[in-house]
UniProtKB/Swiss-Prot annotation:
Residues 87-173, 213-223, 261-265, 314-321, 372-410, 457-460, 553-826 are lumenal. This is Dolichyl-diphosphooligosaccharide--protein glycosyltransferase subunit STT3B. Mn(2+) binds at residues 103, 221, 223. The record marks 214 as: Important for catalytic activity. The chain crosses the membrane at residues 42-86, 174-192, 195-212, 224-243, 246-260, 266-282, 288-313, 322-341, 351-371, 411-433, 440-456, 461-482, 527-552. GO terms for molecular function: dolichyl-diphosphooligosaccharide-protein glycotransferase activity; metal ion binding. The keyword Signal does not apply. The modification Phosphoserine is found at residues 13, 18, 29, 498-499. One of its GO terms (biological process) is glycoprotein catabolic process. It comes from Canis lupus familiaris. The gene is STT3B. A motif (DXD motif 1) lies at residues 101-103. Belongs to the STT3 family.
C-alpha cells in the first residue's frame, strides 16, 4: 500500500510555526493522515489539490527541511542511547565489572560454557553441579537467546582481534541493548502517532527506572534483551497491520522467534496480538490487511517458536496458547462469511451466519473441554494462574509466592519507577482513544492489560514501562504542539475511519435541505481561540520543569536503588566514607579453596546459582525451582531439630551447610527472615512432620527471643544462625546476643551441636558455613557414665618417695567393714 505524501505547503507552515512543530513535520509527512499532526491537503487549499513538491536533487542535502529533521532525529536518538548507556554504569564505576544478583550468575556460567565448548555441546550439556543427586539438562530447560546473543558478540569481537573476556560482554550487554530498546520504542511510537512523540518516548525509556532496574551493567538477565525484542515485535506487527504486507509480517515472525528464545514473557505477545485482532473484529474493523497479517503471523510464528527446545509443543498443548488458536479459527470463519456475503442474499446470509456461528462455537467449546479433560491440553501453569487468582499461589504453591518479584505492586512503586509518567500516561491513552484507528486500538489494549498485570506482580512493571513511556510521550507531544504551534494554522487532526471514506465518496444527499449543514463539517471547521504568549511561555516552562525533575529523579533512583550488586554490599559512615562488605565472595572463595572438588553444599535455593558460579561446588537446589519436592526436603531439614535434619542430610550426602545471617550488621535479607517460607514449602510436602503454627507463639507472633516458640528455638536454622552469637556484645547499650535485624535478644544462647561443626564464618558474620560430621564408628551408649559420691575422709597427699612404697589409686572406693550384731541387741 502506497502511503500518501504530504504537500509542500505543510512542511513550510510547520517549520514557520515553531521549532517543535518543525520536529513533528517529518512524522506527519511520512504517515500522511495516520498521524495527528497531518492535515488534509484539499482542506488546506480550499478544496483544490496543491501542486506536488519538486523532487530534491542530489545537491539538496541539509538545505531541505527533511535533511535537518533527519539529522536532528539521529542526534536525539544517539544522545538517548548514550544517556541510557552511561546511567547504567554506576555499579561498574563504584565497584567493578561483576555479575549481579542470582539468576545472572547461571546465565553467565551457561554463556561461558557456550563460548568455551560450542553451541552443540551447550545444547547437550548435563550440569552435574546442580540439583544433586538429580542433575539438570541445561540445553532443554533454558531460553538460549541471551546466551547465544552474548556468545555471538564475543565471537565477532575475537574474530576482529578485539580481545574481550566473556564476562565483560555479559556485563555490558544489557546497557548496550537499552539503546536498541530506545530505537524500537521510537519506531513504534512514530507508527502510532508522529516523529516528535517517538523521540520523546525514546528519551523516556532510555532513563526510566522501571526499565533500568533490569538492565544495569552486570544484570545479565533475560529481560535485558527481551524488552527490545518485545517492542520491536510490536512495531513490526503494527507495520504489518497498516500495510498488509507479507514481508513485514515475516519480519514480525522472526522478531517473535527471537523473543521466544530470549524470555518466557513471549506469552504476553501471543495473547495480546490475538486480542487485538479479536477486538478489531468486534469493532467491525476487519480488512484484508488484518487477515493477511494475523494468518501469516500465527502460522509462521507458531512453527518458529516450536524450534526452541524448552518451548517444544507448548504452543499447541498449553492453555495460555489456546486464545491465539481460537482467534485464528474465528478469523478464518469471519473471512469465509465475508466471502459468502457477496454471493448470497441478505436473508440466506443471516440464516447461515447464525447457524454457522452457533455450530462453530459449540464445536470449539466441546473440543477444548474434551482435550483438557483427556490431558492433551495442559491447564494453566502456577505462575500464569496466579495472575488471574492473586491468592492462589500463596495457598497452593508457596514456592511461587516466596519470590519477592511475584508480590503485588505497591502504589509507591509506580511513582518510584515511573515518576511523572504515571500522571501523563492516562492523557496519552485518551488522545489515542479519541483519534482511534487500527494501530491505536492495539496500544490501548497493550496499556490496559499491562496496567493490570503490573498491579498483580511487581516483576511485570517491566512490561508496563514501555507503553507508559509511549503514551506519556504522546501526551507531552500534544501539549508542546498545542502551545508551541501557530494559532492561525492549528487544525484538528482527521481520523482514518470507514465513515470518513464514505462521506468523501458521497459528499451530499440528493434530498438534503438547501440550508442544511452537515454536523461533522461544522466541527472540523470550528476555529479555536488564540493563546496569548504569556500562557504559552508559562505552560512550556512548567512542562520543561517536569521533564527536568523526571530526569533528576531517574538519575537518583538509578544511582541509589538499582546500581548495587547483591554480591557486594556497601554502607556509609557519618563522615561519608564507604565500607565495602564483601562477605559473599569471601565465603564462596573459601568454599572453592578449602573444600573437596566434589563437595555438596546445602543451602536455601536463593544461593544455588551463586554457589555453583563462584564457588564451583555442587548444590542441592537452586533458583530454577523446577522440583518443588526437592526444595521442600531442604526446607524440612532447615525446619527440623538437629537429629532429624542430620538424617535428611545423610540421605542427601551433604558435606557442608551454608546459611546467611544478618543479625550482626542488620542485613534484612537473611535466612531467618525467609524462614517461614521454608516452613510453608516443607509443610506442603510433609504436613505430618512440619506445621507452620508450631513456629509461632500462642499469641501468633514469630519471635526469636525467650518468648519464641520452643520448636523455633531448637530448629537447625535457628541454631546455625545464632551459634556463638550469644557470646557477642555488639554495643555497650545492648546485651550480648542482641539481633540488630529483628531488634531482639535471642532466646537460646547456649547452642551446642552434635552432628555439625563450624567450618567458616565471614568477617561480618554474614555467611556461615558448617561441616556435617561423619557418623560415629560405634554408637554411643545412652546411659550416663558412673558417678560416685563416696570420697575418702582424708585428702589425698602423695607420700610416694621410693619405688618400694605402694601406689595409691585416686578416687578409689572405700569400703567400710560391717559390725557383728550382738546377741544382746537381738
Amino acid at each position: 500500500m502506497a502511503e500518501p505524501s504530504a504537500p509542500e505547503s505543510k512542511h513550510k507552515s510547520s517549520l514557520n510555526s515553531s521549532p517543535w512543530s518543525g520536529l513533528m513535520a517529518l512524522g506527519n509527512s511520512r504517515h500522511g493522515h495516520h498521524g495527528p499532526g497531518a492535515q488534509c491537503a484539499h482542506k488546506a487549499a480550499g478544496g483544490v489539490a496543491p501542486p506536488k513538491p519538486a523532487p530534491a536533487g542530489l545537491s539538496g542535502g541539509l538545505s531541505q527541511p527533511a535533511g535537518w529533521q533527519s539529522l536532528l532525529s539521529f542526534t536525539i536518538l544517539f544522545l538517548a542511547w548514550l544517556a541510557g548507556f552511561s546511567s547504567r554504569l554506576f555499579a561498574v564505576i563504584r565497584f567493578e565489572s561483576i555479575i549481579h544478583e542470582f539468576d545472572p550468575w547461571f546465565n553467565y556460567r551457561s554463556t561461558h560454557h557456550l563460548a568455551s565448548h560450542g553451541f552443540y555441546e551447550f545444547l547437550n550439556w548435563f550440569d552435574e553441579r546442580a540439583w544433586y543427586p538429580l542433575g539438570r539438562i541445561v540445553g532443554g530447560t533454558v531460553y538460549p537467546g541471551l546466551m547465544i546473543t552474548a556468545g555471538l558478540i564475543h565471537w565477532i569481537l575475537n574474530t576482529l582481534n578485539i580481545t574481550v573476556h566473556i564476562r565483560d560482554v555479559c556485563v555490558f550487554l544489557a546497557p548496550t541493548f537499552s539503546g536498541l530498546t530506545s530505537i524500537s520504542t521510537f519506531l513504534l511510537t512514530r507508527e502510532l502517532w508522529n516523529q516528535g512523540a517517538g523521540l520523546l518516548a525514546a528519551c523516556f525509556i532510555a532513563i526510566v527506572p522501571g526499565y533500568i532496574s533490569r538492565s544495569v551493567a552486570g544484570s545479565f538477565d533475560n529481560e535485558g534483551i527481551a524488552i527490545f525484542a518485545l517492542q520491536f515485535t510490536y512495531y513490526l506487527w503494527v507495520k504489518s497491520v497498516k500495510t498488509g504486507s507479507v514481508f513485514w509480517t515475516m519480519c514480525c515472525c522472526l522478531s517473535y522467534f527471537y523473543m521466544v528464545s530470549a524470555w518466557g514473557g513471549y506469552v504476553f505477545i501471543i495473547n495480546l496480538i490475538p486480542l487485538h485482532v479479536f477486538v478489531l473484529l468486534l469493532m467491525q474493523r476487519y480488512s484484508k490487511r488484518v487477515y493477511i497479517a494475523y494468518s501469516t503471523f500465527y502460522i509462521v510464528g507458531l512453527i518458529l517458536s516450536m524450534q526452541i527446545p524448552f518451548v517444544g509443543f507448548q504452543p499447541i498443548r498449553t492453555s495460555e496458547h489456546m486464545a491465539a488458536a481460537g482467534v485464528f479459527a474465528l478469523l478464518q470463519a469471519y473471512a469465509f462469511l465475508q466471502y459468502l456475503r457477496d454471493r448470497l442474499t441478505k436473508q440466506e446470509f443471516q440464516t447461515l451466519f447464525f447457524l454457522g456461528v452457533s455450530l462453530a462455537a459449540g464445536a470449539v467449546f466441546l473440543s477444548v473441554i474434551y482435550l483438557t479433560y483427556t490431558g492433551y491440553i495442559a491447564p494453566w501453569s502456577g505462575r500464569f494462574y496466579s495472575l488471574w487468582d492473586t491468592g492462589y499461589a500463596k495457598i497452593h504453591i508457596p514456592i511461587i509466592a516466596s519470590v519477592s518479584e511475584h508480590q503485588p505492586t505497591t502504589w509507591v512503586s509506580f511513582f518510584f519507577d515511573l515518576h511523572i509518567l504515571v500522571c501523563t500516561f492516562p492523557a496519552g491513552l485518551w488522545f489515542c482513544i479519541k483519534n482511534i484507528n487500527d494501530e491505536r486500538v492495539f496500544v490501548a489494549l497493550y496499556a490496559i492489560s499491562a496496567v493490570y498485570f503490573a498491579g498483580v506482580m511487581v516483576r511485570l512493571m517491566l512490561t508496563l514501562t514501555p507503553v507508559v513511556c509511549m503514551l506519556s510521550a504522546i501526551a507531552f507531544s500534544n501539549v508542546f504542539e498545542h502551545y508551541l504551534g501557530d494559532d492561525m494554522k492549528r487544525e484538528n487532526p482527521p481520523v482514518e475511519d470507514s465513515s470518513d471514506e464514505d462521506d468523501k465518496r458521497n459528499p451530499g444527499n440528493l434530498y438534503d435541505k438547501a440550508g442544511k449543514v452537515r454536523k461533522h463539517v461544522t466541527e472540523q471547521e470550528k476555529t479555536e481561540e488564540g493563546l496569548g504568549p504569556n500562557i504559552k511561555s508559562i505552560v512550556t516552562m512548567l512542562m520543561l520543569m517536569l521533564l527536568m525533575m523526571f530526569a533528576v529523579h531517574c538519575t537518583w533512583v538509578t544511582s541509589n536503588a538499582y546500581s548495587s550488586p547483591s554480591v557486594v554490599l556497601a554502607s556509609y559512615n557519618h563522615d561519608g566514607t564507604r565500607n565495602i562488605l564483601d562477605d559473599f565472595r569471601e565465603a564462596y572463595f573459601w568454599l572453592r579453596q578449602n573444600t573437596d572438588e566434589h563437595a555438596r553444599v546445602m543451602s536455601w535455593w536463593d544461593y544455588g546459582y551463586q554457589i555453583a558460579g563462584m564457588a564451583n561446588r555442587t548444590t542441592l537446589v537452586d533458583n530454577n525451582t523446577w522440583n518443588n519436592s526437592h526444595i521442600a526436603l531442604v526446607g524440612k531439614a532447615m525446619s527440623s531439630n538437629e537429629s532429624a535434619a542430620y538424617k535428611i542430610m545423610r540421605s542427601l550426602d551433604v558435606d557442608y551447610v551454608l546459611v546467611i545471617f544478618g543479625g550482626v550488621i542488620g542485613y534484612s535479607g537473611d535466612d531467618i527472615n525467609k524462614f517461614l517460607w521454608m516452613v510453608r514449602i516443607a509443610e506442603g510436602e510433609h504436613p505430618k512432620d512440619i506445621r507452620e503454627s508450631d513456629y509461632f507463639t500462642p499469641q501468633g507472633e514469630f519471635r526469636v527471643d525467650k518468648a519464641g516458640s520452643p520448636t523455633l528455638l531448637n530448629c537447625l536454622m535457628y541454631k546455625m544462625s545464632y551459634y556463638r552469637f550469644g557470646e557477642m556484645q555488639l554495643d555497650f547499650r545492648t546485651p550480648p546476643g542482641f539481633d540488630r535485624t529483628r531488634n531482639a535478644e535471642i532466646g537460646n544462647k547456649d547452642i551446642k551441636f552434635k552432628h555439625l561443626e563450624e567450618a567458616f564464618t565471614s568477617e561480618h558474620w554474614l555467611v556461615r558455613i558448617y561441616k556435617v560430621k561423619a557418623p560415629d564408628n560405634r554408637e554411643t551408649l545412652d546411659h550416663k557414665p558412673r558417678v560416685t559420691n563416696i570420697f575418702p575422709k582424708q585428702k589425698y597427699l602423695s607420700k610416694k618417695t621410693t619405688k618400694r612404697k605402694r601406689g595409691y589409686i585416686k578416687n578409689k572406693l572405700v569400703f567400710k567393714k560391717g559390725k557383728k550384731i550382738s546377741k544382746k541387741t537381738v
